[in-house]
């Protein structure tokens, strides 16, 4: 039986500033899927602490590399958002069917900053009128729309969202903060402080994380009464050269693969969260189960990934129809464009091998000295 996993990862990069189409085609032709590549890559870069892997299979540790090192999560952090939405929906605090105006979401949309995620979502739901709240959440997870994410942050409340990790037994997860608004920090500093580009870069580089988050929150608050104009959005993105993108990427909320495997276990066992929560959460998180081929051999499975120009992350869980349970988290940072492309192309096959091939799991344990 052919077994399929569709790896849908959300991009948080500005692709037009990272690589040209011709270069991408070159890499597409050159780098084919190779699950062994991920193993060799992790072994090569493990000492740098820029790569982290944690895998459990039927409660057995298959691999653990830098599992307590905090790394930027990119869009994988949206799992926390989905959990808070499901909890509020289960408690009757949110109505999944309530109508949300597309125009209210668009104020948070910054063109060319999410790899086309938001536009892809809009192509499905339309660009005018309204959609049910559950579809906004679906757009955040299935398409990885940052605009949907920031809209939901304001709706659900950041205090409630940031209480989720602790409620799941994860005390050191860094706080979430508005993604789109943080992209406006450089242009806002330049205007309000009358900084040059160089002065702005220096100011953000030395800024403490608490202050950085405060700027993002303040910008987000302003947008509630005065959304950014299209011209302001163009000016903000024009400033986001690769050096600004790197600072932004490094300052995204961080956590560990050990943290996220713990969360994946909670989502996988279907016992720790109230069943009413799962009624709202599973249709959002388990996009993989929309594929009929996956339903033939998987009981349930979910995942969320993310990337920037420098980061690639994924967290997933699965239980197959024989009752085998797998939880996996892989986080990486400071990637070259070539390494990121090779990892991305190999990740789906790597996950499939972990889920279905005992010999590959033994190979993983041997390479990472898990006895």
Predicted regions and their residues:
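Structured C-terminal helix/loop/strand segments within mature extracytoplasmic catalytic/sensor domains
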Residues: 4-15, 27-42, 62, 222-371
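Hydrophobic core of alpha-helical transmembrane segments in multi-pass integral membrane proteins
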Residues: 16-21
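Active-site-adjacent loops and short helices of periplasmic peptidoglycan-processing enzymes
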Residues: 26-80, 84-190
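Mid-domain, small-residue-enriched loop/turn segments at the edges of structured enzyme/sensor domains
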Residues: 50, 143-259, 263
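Short low-complexity stretches enriched in small and charged residues
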Residues: 53-61, 103-109, 140, 214-222, ...
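Hydrophobic transmembrane alpha-helix bundles
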Residues: 89-95, 130-144, 187-205, 209-223, ...
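Noncatalytic linker/hinge segments flanking ATPase motor cores
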Residues: 91-100, 139-144, 179-183, 192-195, ...
């Amino acid at each position: 039986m052919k077994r399929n996993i569709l790896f849908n990862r959300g991009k948080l990069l500005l692709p037009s500033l990272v690589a040209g189409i011709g270069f991408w085609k070159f890499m597409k032709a050159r780098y084919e899927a190779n699950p062994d590549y991920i193993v060799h890559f992790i072994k090569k870069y493990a000492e740098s602490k820029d790569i982290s892997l944690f895998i459990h299979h039927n409660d057995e540790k298959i691999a653990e590399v830098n599992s307590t090192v905090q790394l930027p999560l990119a869009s994988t952090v949206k799992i926390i958002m989905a959990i808070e939405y499901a909890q509020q929906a289960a408690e009757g605090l949110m109505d999944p069917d309530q109508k949300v105006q597309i125009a209210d979401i668009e104020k948070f949309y910054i063109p060319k900053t999410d790899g086309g995620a938001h536009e892809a979502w809009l192509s499905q739901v339309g660009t005018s009128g309204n959609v049910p709240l559950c579809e906004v959440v679906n757009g955040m997870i299935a398409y990885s729309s940052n605009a949907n994410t920031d809209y939901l942050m304001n709706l659900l409340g950041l205090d409630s969202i940031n209480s989720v990790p602790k409620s799941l037994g994860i005390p050191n997860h860094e706080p979430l903060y508005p993604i789109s608004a943080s992209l406006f920090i450089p242009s806002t500093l330049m205007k309000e402080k009358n900084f040059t580009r160089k002065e702005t870069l220096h100011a953000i580089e030395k800024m403490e994380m608490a202050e950085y988050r405060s700027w993002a929150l303040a910008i987000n608050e302003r947008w509630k009464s005065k959304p950014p104009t299209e011209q302001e959005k163009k000016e903000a993105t024009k400033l986001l050269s690769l050096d600004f993108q790197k600072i932004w990427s490094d300052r995204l909320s961080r956590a560990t693969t050990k943290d996220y495997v713990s969360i994946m276990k909670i989502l996988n066992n279907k016992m720790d969260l109230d069943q009413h929560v799962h009624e709202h959460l599973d249709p959002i998180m388990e996009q993989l189960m929309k594929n009929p081929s996956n339903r033939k051999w998987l009981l349930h499975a979910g995942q969320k990934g993310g990337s920037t120009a420098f980061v690639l992350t994924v967290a997933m869980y699965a239980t197959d129809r024989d009752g085998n349970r797998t939880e996996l988290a892989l986080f990486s940072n400071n990637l070259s464009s070539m390494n990121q492309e090779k990892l991305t192309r190999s990740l789906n096959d790597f996950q499939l091998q972990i889920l279905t091939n005992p010999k590959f799991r033994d190979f993983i344990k041997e390479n990472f000295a898990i006895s």
